[in-house]
């Protein structure tokens, strides 16, 4: 988990959509009058607001990760591996193949891990075609915010 992020984490589009009228008014003004200052200030405010929201989301994810580590240690100590729990936070869902490849375990063990994590309420399984996805319930809720 100590890798660099290779995708953007500041999504300005939600702020711009929420303030669409102001955005287009200021953008139009830059095109018609050449006045850039107000538009630049708008974008800087968008960056600030989005950064604050992103920091809060990252903090929530970190707290959820820590709480999940504790929950697994307490409720499923036989399957606890920090790498397993961290894998659950790399994306909102896990598949048996992810666990097999990332943790270098047998398919049977990976399946057992995911089913046990579902049993203790961390994951929720969802069948899609032939494959079963295990959704990290709390992470999905955080990402919806």
Task: Please provide the spans of the model-predicted regions.
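Phosphate/pyrophosphate-binding active-site loops
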Residues: 1-58
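Short alpha-helical segments that sit at the start of domains
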Residues: 55-87
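Short, cationic-aromatic polyanion-contact patches
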Residues: 77-78, 125-145
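Short acidic, hydrophobic short linear motifs in intrinsically disordered regions
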Residues: 80-85, 90-103
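Basic amphipathic alpha-helical segments that dock to polyanions
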Residues: 88, 110, 114-120, 134
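Active-site lining segments that contact anionic ligands and/or coordinate catalytic metals
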Residues: 93, 120, 131
């Amino acid at each position: 988990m100590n890798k660099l992020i290779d995708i953007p984490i500041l999504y300005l589009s939600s702020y711009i959509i929420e303030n669409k009228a102001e955005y287009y008014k200021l953008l139009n003004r830059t095109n018609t009058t050449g006045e850039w200052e107000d538009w630049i200030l708008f974008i800087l405010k968008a960056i600030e607001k989005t950064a604050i929201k992103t920091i809060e989301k990252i903090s929530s994810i970190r707290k959820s990760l820590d709480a999940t580590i504790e929950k697994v240690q307490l409720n499923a100590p036989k399957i606890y591996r920090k790498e397993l729990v961290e894998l659950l936070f790399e994306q909102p869902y896990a598949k048996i193949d992810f666990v097999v490849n990332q943790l270098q375990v047998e398919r049977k063990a990976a399946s057992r891990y995911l089913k046990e994590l579902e049993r203790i309420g961390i994951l929720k399984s969802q069948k899609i075609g032939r494959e079963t996805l295990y959704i990290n319930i709390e992470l999905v809720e955080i990402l919806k915010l």
